[in-house]
Design a protein with these regions (language model features):
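Bimodal "functional hotspot" detector
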Residues: 3-177
């Protein structure tokens, strides 16, 4: 099993978005990798962003996402976490087997959180390349840590998603395998 597009992490461009302020809550995933970035200052908090553990994916042993810690502005932590996600893993994290599968997306053009559902609009491209793992996995893993988010709907750059009006998560057809 190979994750198509695993080398996307150098092509990602961070984008500024806006979101409803909330606080982060711990997840039940594997323990986060701590980067050397330090403790948060006043007005900041530590959140997790989730990258693909390429070794686990290649041998078919979940969980495929591994959290790493990032310090973000506490005024809009959901949006800031997505910005950090699209920056990709650090060189040290890449050396440890973490990857960001951008699926041709370059960032997020808009983030809205309404009634505990995050609506994420991708910027750039949108193509899973046939992989069963896509940028949607990273985004969903990163956003559900926040108490403001129970579901994630991801839209392609044209504003389309598979189930816009149904409860629960949704991804655009371009991110289907």
């Amino acid at each position: 099993m190979v994750a198509s597009g695993c080398s996307d992490d150098d092509d990602a461009t961070p984008t500024t978005t806006s979101a409803t302020p909330t606080t982060a809550t711990p997840t039940t995933a594997a323990p986060p990798t701590t980067t050397a970035s330090s403790s948060p200052a006043a007005g900041e908090l530590t959140v997790q962003v989730f990258f693909l553990d390429e070794d686990a994916f290649n041998i078919g042993r979940p969980p495929y996402l591994r959290p790493v810690e990032r310090v973000v502005d506490e005024a809009a932590p959901e949006a800031a976490a997505l910005d950090r996600l699209f920056e990709g893993p650090t060189a040290e994290e890449r050396a440890g087997g973490l990857r960001f599968v951008a699926s041709q997306a370059t960032g997020v053009s808009e983030l809205r959180i309404e009634e505990r559902t995050a609506h994420v609009y991708l910027a750039g491209g949108c193509n899973s390349g046939g992989s069963t793992f896509s940028v949607a996995d990273h985004i969903t893993g990163t956003l559900v840590q926040f108490t403001s988010v129970d579901a994630v709907k991801i839209y392609d750059p044209d504003g389309q998603t598979a189930s816009p009006d149904e409860p629960g998560d949704s991804v655009p057809f371009c991110l289907e395998p």
